[in-house]
């Protein structure tokens, strides 16, 4: 490990014209991070430090290795290290890698939930990065990774990525920041207590619906949803299933637009597992990013763009049949037992109606709307179980 320092000079800030730029410790102490490879930038460090908080909290809450895929200071995906089914391994493009370590499974899930958004991500890992995880990272387009450590083999693999320029950051897992945090906006200093809220079973005890039966797996998914939201730009909602986020709606001014955006991402995750998409025959040599783009267009309303004569031949060996609206709805109707978390209350029941279309069965939200009764009534209509946490999770 390289020698620690209390300041790192950066090439520039958010944009190339914002100079000078650095990260440093105001009290003169050593930074909790060490750059092992590459030259991370301003936004890289923002993603890294937010992502590290997310995965370390997921590990604490679930006892499982965790990973997140960050883009522009919000997670595109987050997951814990549960084994992959054959179908998930295929849609995440890791079915050729054999059995993966739990940490590698966590990153495959985090990256795979929304591969379009995760392109060029910054990765955070809760555990020491092993060779399996490094091999998975090496094949993806990514800006960098932060972890509490790296095996010798993993570090060698990562240092060879991007012609030797891949950003690798090591963080001291014992580091704890001060209880008060500050930032400046337009020369004015803002100060607040850190959000040290623990997402635990006690927070998930106030069920307000008729259905109060929630399996252990769904309680874990609720924790994943809320911890993910804690580090997502508000307004935000998060759909979770099977130990991973499957749709995150971030930074929307309207709650229903969050729910729709994240719901569409969850729908796309499920549609990728349909026979129509699994049966696509890509031309030899087509890269993962091009396959992802082709699938995204094929599943969407603009499918004719990828099925046009002279276009489909560049992506597919055989021209795919149109994936009709009726076929998609029939497949989506099979998606069940999804968990939905929200960083603030649902003001109208339209959010519940939209969530139902994406298979939501369990909901965790603060409550506190003047229309809570209408929201609860809508949940009862669909036999959903909803918990009021009483805690808002805004993040800016």
Give the predicted meaning of each segment.
Residues 27-39, 113-119, 193-212, 290-311, ...:
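Gly-rich Lys/Arg/Thr-decorated short loops/hinges at beta-loop-alpha junctions or inter-strand turns
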Residues 74, 129, 241-244, 252, ...:
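Active-site-proximal loop/turn and secondary-structure-junction residues that shape catalytic pockets
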Residues 1-203, 218-236:
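Active-site loops and adjacent core secondary-structure elements that bind or stabilize anionic groups
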Residues 57, 231, 268-272, 357, ...:
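Conserved helix-loop functional segments at active or binding sites
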Residues 128, 207-217, 346:
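Bateman/CBS regulatory modules and CBS-like beta-alpha motifs in cytosolic regions of diverse proteins
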Residues 76-116, 246-348:
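Glycine- and Gly-Pro-enriched alpha-helical subdomains that act as flexible
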Residues 121, 125-126, 139-169, 174-176, ...:
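C-terminal binding/interaction regions
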Residues 61-69, 168-171, 234-241, 271-282, ...:
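Flexible, glycine/charged-enriched surface loops at secondary-structure junctions
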């Amino acid at each position: 490990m390289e020698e620690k320092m209390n300041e790192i000079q950066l090439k520039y800030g958010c944009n190339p014209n914002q100079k000078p730029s650095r990260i440093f410790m105001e009290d003169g102490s050593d930074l909790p991070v060490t750059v092992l490879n590459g030259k991370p930038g301003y936004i890289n460090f923002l993603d890294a430090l937010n992502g590290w908080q997310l995965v370390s909290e997921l590990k604490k809450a679930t006892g499982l290795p965790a990973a997140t895929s960050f883009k522009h200071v919000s997670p595109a995906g987050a997951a814990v290290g549960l084994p992959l089914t054959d179908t998930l391994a295929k849609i995440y493009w890791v079915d050729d890698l054999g059995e993966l370590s739990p940490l590698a499974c966590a990153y495959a899930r985090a990256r795979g939930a929304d591969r379009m958004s995760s392109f060029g991500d910054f990765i955070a890992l809760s555990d020491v990065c092993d060779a399996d995880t490094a091999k998975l990272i090496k094949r993806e387009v990514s800006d960098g990774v932060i972890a509490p450590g790296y095996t010798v083999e993993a570090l060698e693999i990562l240092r060879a990525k991007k012609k030797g320029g891949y950003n690798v950051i090591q963080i001291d897992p014992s580091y704890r920041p001060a209880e008060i945090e500050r930032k400046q906006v337009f020369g004015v200093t803002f100060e607040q207590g850190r959000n040290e809220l623990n997402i635990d079973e006690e927070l998930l005890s106030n069920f307000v619906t008729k259905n109060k039966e929630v399996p252990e797996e769904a309680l874990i998914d609720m924790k994943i949803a809320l911890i993910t939201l804690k580090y997502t730009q508000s307004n935000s909602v998060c759909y979770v299933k099977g130990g991973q986020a499957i749709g995150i709606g971030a930074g929307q001014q309207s709650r229903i637009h969050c729910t729709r955006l994240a719901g569409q991402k969850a729908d796309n995750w499920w549609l990728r597992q349909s026979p129509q998409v699994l049966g696509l025959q890509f031309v030899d040599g087509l890269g993962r990013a091009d396959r992802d783009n082709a699938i995204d267009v094929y599943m969407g309303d603009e499918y004719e763009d990828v099925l046009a004569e002279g276009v489909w031949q560049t992506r597919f060996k055989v021209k795919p049949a149109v994936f009709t609206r009726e076929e998609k709805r029939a497949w989506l109707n099979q998606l069940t037992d999804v968990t939905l978390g929200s960083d603030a209350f649902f003001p109208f029941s339209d959010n519940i109606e939209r969530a139902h279309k994406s298979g939501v069965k369990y909901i965790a939200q603060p409550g506190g709307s003047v229309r809570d009764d209408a929201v609860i009534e809508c949940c009862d209509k669909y036999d959903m179980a909803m918990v009021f946490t009483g805690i808002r999770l805004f993040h800016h």
